[in-house]
């Protein structure tokens, strides 16, 4: 008896289900060209519940009955999105636009969209849009959130017109011009608060919402509109409030779902849950599953369904998720099997390869081709290697390699002082001149960090250009500089002449340059002591004194600046970058050259006369010494126009007895003021506008050594006192107008070498900066 009753109930349920499906199949499927899929429906018995009833007005305009809004489109949830976020169906409706002060009146607050208790809520892709001058709009019924935005019509911002207020405001400002007509939406700007503004909705299930336009600003007139929409608005289509007001409506995206309470509709679909499907996918057993449903009983008690991957159709009608034949349709218009046979599966496909003969033929052909290509490649490599060897010999000879070898052999006691590297050694040392090995770049060349086979770390300077007419002078200069052995001068270790331009190898200084330690933010507290700065000044002065006086031939550096002063791990200074240096014979006192140097460090007398003397290096050293005392940059746009260069700033401060005001705050409290004062007097003498009144580097070096040696009651060497003539001198400085223009400049510090054989002829660097 019990068994018969169960069978009867099952038969009755099946019959009712068949009847429901039959009725559903006879229901209208479209209204006004818009698809109406189940659970939505038109007419009694054609929809799942009252929430989903669609009324087709005049057989052309569909309305969602429960909220009386025109329907634009209905779609199901996206299955692919479900594995990252809960997917919902989408129904787009037309919602009234709130307006104020427009030509034909309007709704001041708009109509309230209330879906409380319904299986609908606002999608998170909707935005609040407000259009019009001085329009402040906000959302209502979104407590505790406060959502709103304000649009203005201020024209104070200096932006291109095609990024301003769109075509309407372009015409209002410039008249009906062709330029305004040609504004392209490709160059348009999203609503940014000028003419129109936008605001995002609260990130939660919002079922009741309204739009309000603030009317407290009585002085602001003109049409203002505000609305919620899922469409994107730019200045070109969102800057005409009258046009938007005339439209009356805009589209809003609602998300819909199925209530799971009090009915077994979802269970009758035969769909798998997301959790079940995830387990099946893990075991590769997901094929054949047509639809999926996601349940949430903890918050709103809803369920959403979709067809699984490889299926399409309506998941809310049993059996309506149909398999996609990928072998016929392909994926994104492309065939799924480029080789072999495509076999369609329920929810997927596979590619079968049954005939192996083409594969064997293909492999044999490929192997033969590879052997042939390998032979050609080996022959190519052999010929290329021979060409490279011949090219290296050619470069070595052209770059003066034979002359250098001869001079190194005939120079007694200096045969091993300079090494001639081959190109392979330097390529290996720098990982084939890898970009990761670059230490710095300038107009003259690029410096790489390298490690030789003996473990020494070196700086490898690869020049950009070469003057072939001065290669002999270059070789002579290499020999001269290689003989310099001073602890405060970066050592030239050797060169490579097998490349198209000579490559120079210097010792590597690991601790950066003085500029970085003085002016860049750093955790190094060593530079906060006056003793370290004074020692650096002594080191620099000693190196320049050696170059000017003690070297076999006097050498003028010509580009002394803080970026060319390297610091080793013990913060001992080493002078670097001889790219513009010049040697002079003992019977000459100056060089006439093309002006080259760095703004802020350049001798003004040299700038005027183009005659570089040893006193020009003294001037540049004076600027560096002033940097050490003040901590200021040689050129700073933070200072006023008259004090823009440090030389002017420092000299005027010294004349006005304001030394204590300009001492670097990092050393002011811990320094010995008598030492700083003595050093400042030397810096002032070095910065004298007339070169003949400056001390020599030898005098400067001796005086700084004396300052460093005596800490109390010292009496530094006094130079001739300033006279009235100096006070009448007009400061001649390198003009610095702005951050973007400098009258004379030079490349950043790199290692390089250049020479001259005449003291009166115009000379340019071998590697121009």
UniProtKB/Swiss-Prot annotation:
The modification Phosphotyrosine is found at residues 506, 606. The modification Phosphothreonine is found at residues 593, 598. The active site is at 559 (proton acceptor). Residues 380-769 are cytoplasmic. Keywords: ATP-binding, Disulfide bond, Glycoprotein, Kinase, Membrane, Nucleotide-binding, Phosphoprotein, Serine/threonine-protein kinase, Signal, Transferase, Transmembrane, Transmembrane helix. ATP binds at residues 439-447, 461. Disulfide bonds join 293-305, 327-342, 337-351. Residues 433-718 form the Protein kinase domain. It is found in: Membrane. This is Wall-associated receptor kinase-like 10. It comes from Arabidopsis thaliana.
